[in-house]
């Protein structure tokens, strides 16, 4: 009986460990962005503790801008996509935009955070920033990773890959004041669908981008890791 109890406790520990595989962070792991382009004369090259790679125009003071408008990020990845990935190119832009808006509003870093819907002209004027960008990589990977108790993974599914580039624009002058690039990439653990893994990865990118914007709004300069 004692041996059976020990075996059951061991099985419970293994089950809990398997359940928690990959739960230490949200979505895929952050990676160095691949060949970020930037905008105009700004290219994201400086490592940031949250937003990946960034560049901030000299003299930019975000405290002078009480409002910010968030537009939808189109998917510009021209690679071959399967049916599920094609569906995500339609749903993820609005999902990501909403994640940014909700998280940024919760910080109270700006007195007004506008969500700009597709087909609506982005607001402009003094004291207003516009966050725009594009999703340059979107590959859902798959959820076919196989975990074998006591042995580890016998197979890892194709890697989920997502990369974004953003621009922070002064809407009065049209000048780009800051740019960022972030990338998430990792195989799916197999404990969630490919779609939910992609969504979690974009949640994480929204969270970390907002952390960067919050620091800018407080007048803090971009820091190196």
Q: For the regions a protein language model found, what residue spans apply to each?
A:
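C-terminal motif of bacterial Sec signal peptides marking the signal peptidase cleavage site
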Residues: 20-22
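A structural "domain/chain start" motif
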Residues: 24-99, 211-225
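Surface-exposed short loop/turn segments
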Residues: 32-34, 113-175, 192
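Envelope-exposed proteins and targeting segments
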Residues: 64-71, 100, 109, 127-131, ...
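Extracytoplasmic/secreted envelope proteins and their assembly/folding machinery
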Residues: 93, 97, 101, 107, ...
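Sec-exported extracytoplasmic/periplasmic mature domains
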Residues: 100-109, 140, 186, 210-218
């Amino acid at each position: 009986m004692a041996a059976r109890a020990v075996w059951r406790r061991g099985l419970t520990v293994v089950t809990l460990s398997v359940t928690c595989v990959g739960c230490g962070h949200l979505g895929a792991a952050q990676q160095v962005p691949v060949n970020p382009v930037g905008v105009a004369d700004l290219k994201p090259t400086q490592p940031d503790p949250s937003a990946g790679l960034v560049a901030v125009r000299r003299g930019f003071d975000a405290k002078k801008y009480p409002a910010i408008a968030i537009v939808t990020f189109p998917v510009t990845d021209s690679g071959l996509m399967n049916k599920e990935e094609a569906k995500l190119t339609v749903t993820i832009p609005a999902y990501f935009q909403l994640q940014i808006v909700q998280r940024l509003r919760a910080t109270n870093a700006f007195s007004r955070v506008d969500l700009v819907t597709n087909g609506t002209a982005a607001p402009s004027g003094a004291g207003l920033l516009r966050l725009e960008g594009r999703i340059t990589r979107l590959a859902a990977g798959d959820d076919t990773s196989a975990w074998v108790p006591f042995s580890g993974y016998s197979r890892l599914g194709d890697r989920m890959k997502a990369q974004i580039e953003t621009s922070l624009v002064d809407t009065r002058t049209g000048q780009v004041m800051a740019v960022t690039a972030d990338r998430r990439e990792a195989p799916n653990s197999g404990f969630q669908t490919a779609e939910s893994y992609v969504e979690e990865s974009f949640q994480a990118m929204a969270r970390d981008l907002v952390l960067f914007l919050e620091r800018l709004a407080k007048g803090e300069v971009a820091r190196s890791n």
